[in-house]
């Protein structure tokens, strides 16, 4: 199980996204509806994140690395990543999660660096965005 939260850059994340054992968790609140998102990401808004921890655990079953982000990854992304790590530490169930990471500079940094974004309205995003 993951022992701590680490950070990953957008450049490092791009090749990681090809691995089916990676999940991206977007914890932005309403701005995700209006902005784009990383294709295939799971959306668990920070304002209700604590209540949805078991749901996230189920949705990411079999994943080894979870990468959390908000707009800037300064507050919501890191705090939700830590909350999920604490949840896994206290949960009675087995977890495949070995790494919990936060995307440096968040979604805004991802988009500003020219990384691909998805503008679909699917929930959850199926990851086949153009």
From Swiss-Prot:
Gene3D superfamilies: Rhodanese-like domain. The keyword DNA damage does not apply. This is Arsenate reductase 2.2. Possesses arsenate reductase activity in vitro. Catalyzes the reduction of arsenate [As(V)] to arsenite [As(III)]. May play a role in arsenic retention in roots. It catalyses: [glutaredoxin]-dithiol + arsenate + glutathione + H(+) = glutathionyl-S-S-[glutaredoxin] + arsenite + H2O. Its EC number is 1.20.4.1. It comes from the Eukaryota. InterPro entries: Rhodanese-like_dom, Rhodanese-like_dom_sf. The active site is at residue 70. Residues 18-119 form the Rhodanese domain. It is an enzyme of class 1 (oxidoreductase). Keywords: Oxidoreductase. Coiled coil: none annotated.
């Amino acid at each position: 199980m993951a022992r701590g939260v680490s950070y990953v850059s957008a450049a490092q994340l791009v090749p990681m996204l090809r691995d089916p054992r990676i999940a991206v968790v977007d914890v932005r609140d309403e701005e995700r509806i209006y902005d784009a998102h990383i294709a295939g990401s799971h959306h668990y808004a920070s304002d209700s994140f604590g209540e949805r921890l078991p749901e996230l655990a189920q949705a990411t079953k079999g994943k080894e690395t979870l990468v959390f982000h908000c707009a800037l990854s300064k507050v919501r992304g890191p705090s939700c990543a830590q909350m999920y790590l604490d949840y896994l530490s206290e949960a009675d169930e087995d977890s495949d999660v070995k790494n919990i990471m936060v995307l440096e500079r968040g979604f805004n940094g991802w988009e500003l660096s020219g990384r691909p974004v998805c503008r679909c309205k699917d929930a959850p995003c199926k990851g086949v965005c153009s």
